[in-house]
Each structure stands twice: as C-alpha cells, then as structure tokens.
Design a protein with these regions (language model features):
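Early extracytoplasmic/lumenal segment of secretory-pathway proteins
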Residues: 1-14
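Short helix-initiation/N-cap motifs at beta->coil->alpha
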Residues: 1, 92-97, 168-186
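Glycine-centered hinge/linker elements that transmit conformational signals in sensory
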Residues: 99-102, 137-176
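Conserved C-terminal helix/tail region of periplasmic/extracytoplasmic solute-binding proteins
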Residues: 245-254, 262-357
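Extracytoplasmic/periplasmic substrate-recognition and gating elements
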Residues: 209-279
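Short, solvent-exposed loop/beta-turn-alpha elements that line the ligand-binding surface or hinge
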Residues: 30-42, 87-91, 130-151, 210, ...
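Hinge/lid segment of periplasmic solute-binding proteins
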Residues: 11-67, 96, 221
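Extracytoplasmic/periplasmic solute-binding protein
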Residues: 51-69, 77, 94-142
Length: 357
C-alpha cells in the first residue's frame, strides 16, 4: 500500500477553498469524479457552487447549515411571545417579528439581552441572500456594495444601537458568564443565540446551559427571513473533500467520495437515532433539523471570506462585526463600506488573477 494514499482532506471548515486552488495545493477533480453520474446527479447544483476558474475542486457530499437561531421555549412562554417554530410554520418568522421580540425582551437593568454568541453578525447578514464574499461564474466577488447587504446591515446596526446585544467587550470579549455555548438561554437572560446545531448535538451535560433538552425547553429555527423576501436563506457550509495536488491515487479518492455520497442518507438516519437516543432530542427538534437541512439545500448562502487568504480573513473580521460590535465601537454600514471596500476589492482582484497552474 506504499505510495497508494488518496491524499485528500475535508472541505468542511470552508477555509481551504478556493485558497487551495489559488496556490495549487489542491487538484481540480472534473477528470476524477463523474458529476454527471446517477450517484452525483442529486447534488449537481451544490457541486457547481464550488467551481473556481471553470473547474470543480470540492466533492460535495451534502450541505452543512452553519447557524440556527436557538432559543428556550420556557422563556418564550413566560414572556408570552409567539413561538418562533410556529411563526416559521406559518411563514411569519420575519425580521420585523424577530426585531419586535428582541426590542421587547432586552432590559440592561435586568441583565437581559436578546442576542448573544460569536456568530450573530454572519448569521444575520446572510438572511439577505448574499454572502459578503461569494462566488459567481467561477470567480470571487465582493458583495459589500449590494443593496440587499446594506439593507440587512442597517437592521443589524439598529439592533445594536437599541442595546439588545450582550456586551462582550465588558466580559473579556466572551459571551455571557464564562463564555460557554448557550450560557444565558437556560437562565432566561438571553432570548436568541445564533449558533451551529453542533452545539446542541451533544450530551445533556454539555447542553444544559441552553436548558433541558429532554423537557422540551430547547428549540431552534432558521434565522428570520427578510420581510420583502419569500425565502429563508441559510448560512451554509459543506460536507465534502478536496484532492491534494499530484495525489498518487485519484481513483482511491473517487472511490471514497462515491461511497460517502451513496451512504449519506443512511449516515443521516444514524445521526438522528443518536440525537434521539443519546442526546434526548425531541421529535420537534429532529424535524426542524431536517427542515433546516432542506432549506440549506434550496437556499444556501456560501461565504468564502475565510477561504482566500489570511489577509482577507483578518480584514473581514473587522467588516463582519462593524455594525454590531459592542462597547460603543459599532459603525454604520455606509462607514464600513467606505473604510474597507477598496481593500477587499483589491484582495479579491488579486486572488482571481493569480491562480497558480
């Protein structure tokens, strides 16, 4: 088996593509994987989302929703709010409703804040349907100047200015308490935490900060839709693989990803059984997880800001938190664009132009 390794690695972190293609670290796989075959036909659109410079680089098995809007059902009930899950079922889970609940719940004197976590900036931005850094026609694009992005960022800025966000600047830039995921939901001091389902896909001991999963206190929904949209967009990652440059066994890579693709539905079934039997998930949680995966397949928002270069990732940290950073540092989106758009444009232009062969 010497020198017979497939030499591939996961694309799940969204930090290796298109960087790997730009630097010739990974191979295009159009001549390795038959995306027109029956095995891959159901995910043709997904795989086409990872075309760079005219070539496929990611063997995308399935989507991976990045964020959900987690909440505590007891808090919703005690404050006489409409359950977000019911609002979603009735297609009424909108930015207006979300904002209304956030403004009503927040009370700094009572130490209540509507939003906490590390990812609400990205999660909320993507509800407009556009990532800050996207791919169009096989090229990177900077969407900071999109009107839709400006609209949602203005909504985000207004939330922060109305003091609905927990002030991480006063807590050593950690979330409430010691920074544990879910802190504040179980104690009913936080209304919503945008976070990945991975934080809830764990033992009751690990998820107790959110509330009691077994007793039905923990629930989640997609992030709200824009009022003028008929779609719930989902910040989306990928479950997939990249092939290393000059890998000695591309056939082995092809065999592996084909097996992963064929087994994917059974993997999902096994995961759901574990969630129910080991992690105490309710039927409502299982069904909502399925719903959000379906939404991610239908309305994905893939952001490539961490997959280009360290320089862009660092710059986008500033951009991502511009309108919602706590501690008095928030700026309007207009100011953020004026200060950062040209620098982002330059990095994107260089990345598109300097693709290694």
């Amino acid at each position: 088996m010497a020198n017979d390794s497939p030499d591939f690695f996961p694309a799940d972190d969204m930090d290796a593509f298109p960087k790997g293609a730009i630097k010739a670290i990974v191979e295009p796989i159009d001549d390795v994987v038959d995306f027109s075959s029956d095995i891959w036909s159901s995910s043709q659109t997904l795989n086409d989302s990872f075309v760079f410079n005219g070539k496929h680089y990611v063997a995308a098995i399935d989507v991976r929703p990045q964020y959900v809007c987690a909440y505590n059902t007891k808090t919703i009930s005690d404050f006489c709010y409409d359950d977000p899950a019911e609002l979603y079922a009735n297609d009424e889970w909108t930015w207006s409703k979300f904002t209304e609940m956030c403004l009503d719940f927040a009370d700094s004197e009572a130490d209540r804040y509507a939003l906490d976590g590390y990812w609400y900036g990205k999660a909320l931005n993507d509800t407009c349907g556009y990532p800050l850094i996207g791919l169009e026609d096989g090229k990177l694009v900077n969407n900071m100047g999109k009107a839709e992005v400006g609209t949602v960022q203005d909504l985000m800025y207004n939330l922060e200015k109305n003091n609905v966000v927990f002030d991480r600047s006063s807590n050593n830039w950690k979330t409430r308490g010691d920074g544990a995921n879910g802190e504040g939901l179980g104690s009913q001091l936080t209304l919503f935490i945008p976070i990945g389902t991975w934080a809830l896909e764990d033992t009751p001991e690990k998820t107790k900060t959110f509330g009691s999963v077994k007793d039905g206190e923990v629930m989640f929904v997609p992030m709200p839709r824009m009022d003028d949209s008929d779609k719930y967009y989902v910040s989306t990652g990928v479950n997939g693989y990249l092939l290393c440059k000059n890998a000695p066994n591309p056939d082995g890579f092809n065999a592996f990803v084909n097996c992963c693709k064929v087994a994917n539905s059974e993997v999902q079934n096994i995961t759901e059984e574990q969630l129910k039997n080991d992690y105490d998930w309710t039927d409502d949680m299982i069904e909502m997880r399925k719903t959000i995966y379906d939404l991610a397949r239908q309305n994905p928002v893939f952001d490539f800001q961490d997959g280009v270069s360290a320089e862009l990732s660092t710059l986008m940290q500033t951009v991502n938190q511009a309108t919602m950073i706590t501690g008095g540092g928030a700026t309007t989106w207009t100011e953020c664009v004026a200060e950062n758009q040209k620098a982002v444009d330059y990095i994107i232009k260089e990345a598109n132009a300097n693709v290694a062969e």
